[in-house]
Amino acid sequence: MPYSRDITKFITATEPEVGLPLLALQRSKSIIGVILLVISLLFIFIGIIILSVSSYTTTGSIFVVLSLILGGGGFFLIYKDNS
């Protein structure tokens, strides 16, 4: 949606009680995306350590799969916010 930023600015200017939360939500998407990416990197490291050190292969695999899901969600939020 190329016009989403313009609509948000228009709503903020005309109705601040509606527009300001929309503007805050728009900015928080990239912050949430970065947090998801950091958590996914942490899960990757935990999963690799679990897979390499102990015999808990199922737990390590779950951490790696969770990291891929969270990382994909983080990339999606950052991409949608910057487009």
From Swiss-Prot:
Compartments, record wording: Virion membrane
Induction: Expressed in the late phase of the viral replicative cycle.
Annotated Gene Ontology cellular component terms: membrane; virion membrane
Positions of transmembrane segments: 31-51, 59-79
Keywords of the record: Late protein, Membrane, Transmembrane, Transmembrane helix, Virion
Family (UniProt): Belongs to the asfivirus EP84R family.
UniProt name for this protein: Transmembrane protein EP84R
